[in-house]
UniProtKB/Swiss-Prot annotation:
Has the structural arrangement of an alpha-helix connected to a beta-sheet by disulfide bonds (CSalpha/beta). Keywords: Calcium-activated potassium channel impairing toxin, Disulfide bond, Ion channel impairing toxin, Neurotoxin, Potassium channel impairing toxin, Secreted, Signal, Toxin. One of its GO terms (cellular component) is extracellular region. It comes from Olivierus martensii. InterPro entries: Scorpion_toxin-like_sf, Toxin_alpha-KTx_8/9. The keyword Protein biosynthesis does not apply. This is Potassium channel toxin alpha-KTx 9.1. Blocks small conductance calcium-activated potassium channels (KCNN, SK). Weakly inhibits the Kv7.1/KCNQ1 channel (10 uM of the toxin inhibits currents by 23.3%). Low toxicity by intracerebroventricular injection into mice.
């Protein structure tokens, strides 16, 4: 029973880590893709040090 509980805890911890790692908010978009990336957000695309910023 304790092995099953340990396995369930490991699987849950891995799911939480994957959710944090694959967070789309941390997505880095280059300057070339910046206008398309900001297009649907009604924002003005600017590029600072090679990183896209969508300024509302």
């Amino acid at each position: 029973m304790s092995r099953l509980f340990t396995l369930v805890l490991i699987v849950l911890a891995m799911n939480v880590m994957m959710a944090i790692i694959s967070d789309p908010v941390v997505e880095a978009v280059g300057c070339e893709e910046c206008p398309m990336h900001c297009k649907g957000k009604n924002a003005k695309p600017t590029c600072d040090d090679g990183v896209c910023n969508c300024n509302v």
